[in-house]
From Swiss-Prot:
The gene is rpoZ. One of its GO terms (cellular component) is DNA-directed RNA polymerase complex. Disulfide bonds: none annotated. Its EC number is 2.7.7.6. GO terms for molecular function: DNA binding; DNA-directed RNA polymerase activity. SMART domains: RNA_pol_Rpb6. This is DNA-directed RNA polymerase subunit omega.
Amino acid sequence: MARVTVQDAVEKIGNRFDLVLVAARRARQLQVGAKDPLVPEENDKMTVIALREIEEGLINGKILDARERQEQQEQEAAELQAVSAIAEGRR
């Protein structure tokens, strides 16, 4: 199990309140299986993995926002394509 110091992660994010928000978002992504860990799991809990990713500079609020925007755009494009295919089938 890797040892994570919150102070190291706080320095990467800026303050402890934003750290909690970013770590919680990332841990939730990992927990539901939406994303794969960017660091070895080493039998750690998802919150520890999220903190290790933050500590190593692999994840921050801007990165999470950009990834979520990209995923949303991809989902919207897929939905639009599906609607177009349905509309074409009715003609």
